[in-house]
Amino acid sequence: VPMYPGGKVETETDASARTFADFIGAKLVSADEHEVVAELSIQPHHWNLARIVHGGVYMSLLDSAMGLLVSLHYPNCPVVTTNLNIHFTEPASEGTLVCRAKFIHRARSTMTVEGRVYLGEDRLCAHATGSFRVLKLPS
C-alpha cells in the first residue's frame, strides 16, 4: 500500500506512486482525522556512512505522515510544510520504523503537528514538530 491509499485520500492514489514517500518505501498503516501511522522497513540504502538510518530518511517519513494528516482535513487543497524541527534521539540500523503523527494545534489555514518515529513500538528514534499551511482554502 503506498503512502496515500484509498479512503479519504482516494484522490491522491494515482499520484502516490510518484511521491518521495513511496520512493523511500514508506507504507501507510492507518489514517484518520486524529492520527496518521506510517512505517518503513529499514534497508541498507537508508543508511548513512555510519550504517545507521540517515537523518533525511527520518525527516522525510515525518514530513510525509504529518503532511498527510493535515491533507486529510483539506482534501484537494495543496498543503506545504513551512517549518520542521526535529530531534534525533537514538540511532537505528535494522528493523521497522513506525511513525505517528498527531495534531498539536489547528487554525483555519495553518496547523501544528507532532510526529514521533519509533523503532518498533517503543524505542524513540526521532521527535518532530512541524507547521503546515493550506495554500488554497476551500470556498
Name each model-derived stretch.
Residues 1-139:
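Terminal targeting signals and extreme-terminal segments of soluble enzymes
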